[in-house]
Amino acid sequence: MINLGDKHSTIVVAMSGGVDSSAVAAMLHEQGHNVIGITLQLYDHGMAVGKKNACCAGQDIYDAKMVANKLGIPHYVLDYESKFKESVIDNFVDSYLQGETPLPCVQCNNSVKFRDLIKTARELGASQLATGHYVRKVSGDNGVELHTGLDPAKDQSYFLFTTTKEQLEYLSFPLGWFTKDETRKLASKFGLEVAYKPDSQDICFVPDGNYKSVINTIRPNASESGKIIHINGFALGEHSGIINYTIGQRRGLGIAYNEPLYVVKIDPKDNIVYVGPEAALHVQEFIIKDVNWLADEIKDNKKLEVAVKIRSTRPPRLAAISKLGDDKMKIRFLSAEKAVAPGQACVIYAGERVLGGGWITRDIR
């Protein structure tokens, strides 16, 4: 079992009400730490009425409170709704309106879950903030490093690439060395009712998976129709609003043609969705912005061969990277990759170690 330092130290645990963070709280409590549970109320629960398996909903806050009561630890629910809307939901909506495919879970980790919650944990006198993420914090020759979770099926390193080295020093991830089954067995050993609670799915603030309704509620004129144009220049029909399309999409285009067509580009300025054959989706290189680099000892101004992930569900692909200014990098695949979508994350790995990452821009070739 992972031991997080001296007994009787104060550790804040970010408790979502799920099995992972509950197991972390129980583990640390058993080790003798002074555990404080904090659950964040992130959005209007009414928006998620009827949605099952969504994190941070009303049931999850109740479950976190019940776990804390069973363990006999203090538990606080913090209203972060306005911060969450400003940092995550508004960014999510604006990203779709810009023809991008956003990744709100990364924005949430980067802002309210780490930046703001670390500040709160420090104010409470905690020596660490522990979470239920499946990643590992490893001590390297040049300081702390972020590594993939030991269980590749549950690894969440892709979603934590924006974590800074300063934040990483303060954070702890006890489940990085566990499989999901081991976590559930641990929770069961502690007698936690959430031991076999289903994992959260999809985006927590999107009712029934219908993100379009969220966008249209916040931006009522979001679904403005426009042209669908073939990449060869001729019009094929009209679309129902660029928020309804993403790079690589094939279904639901509503157009007839003599070969399968895919969304290959979205132009928000002129409100155009461009389509083309599958071959048009292949990308050799692209630019990422707002790069967070965690490997200070590696001279990132040189060309490096690494592995990169452009979607959480895709395996890493070999690529060469080179620095462009202070916060941009060029990524060049060793062999072309399909459907690189602006707004998604590109995370850079050297084996199991996360070197850094950034956001995919429109500069795609």
From Swiss-Prot:
It holds the Pfam family tRNA_Me_trans_M. Residues 154-156 are annotated as: Interaction with tRNA. Keywords: ATP-binding, Cytoplasm, Disulfide bond, Nucleotide-binding, RNA-binding, Transferase, tRNA processing, tRNA-binding. One of its GO terms (cellular component) is cytoplasm. GO terms for biological process: tRNA wobble position uridine thiolation. It is found in: Cytoplasm. Disulfide bonds join 108-204. ATP binds at residues 14-21, 40, 132. It catalyses: S-sulfanyl-L-cysteinyl-[protein] + uridine(34) in tRNA + AH2 + ATP = 2-thiouridine(34) in tRNA + L-cysteinyl-[protein] + A + AMP + diphosphate + H(+). The record marks 133, 344 as: Interaction with tRNA. InterPro entries: MnmA-like, MnmA-like_C, MnmA-like_central, MnmA-like_central_sf, Rossmann-like_a/b/a_fold. It is an enzyme of class 2 (transferase). One of its GO terms (molecular function) is tRNA binding. The active site is at 108 (nucleophile), 204 (cysteine persulfide intermediate). Its EC number is 2.8.1.13. It comes from the Bacteria. Its main location: cytoplasm. Belongs to the MnmA/TRMU family. Catalyzes the 2-thiolation of uridine at the wobble position (U34) of tRNA, leading to the formation of s(2)U34. PANTHER family: MITOCHONDRIAL TRNA-SPECIFIC 2-THIOURIDYLASE 1 (PTHR11933:SF5), TRNA 5-METHYLAMINOMETHYL-2-THIOURIDYLATE -METHYLTRANSFERASE (PTHR11933). NCBIfam families: PRK00143.1, trmU. This is tRNA-specific 2-thiouridylase MnmA. It comes from Rickettsia akari (strain Hartford). The lineage of its organism: Bacteria, Pseudomonadati, Pseudomonadota, Alphaproteobacteria, Rickettsiales. The gene is mnmA.
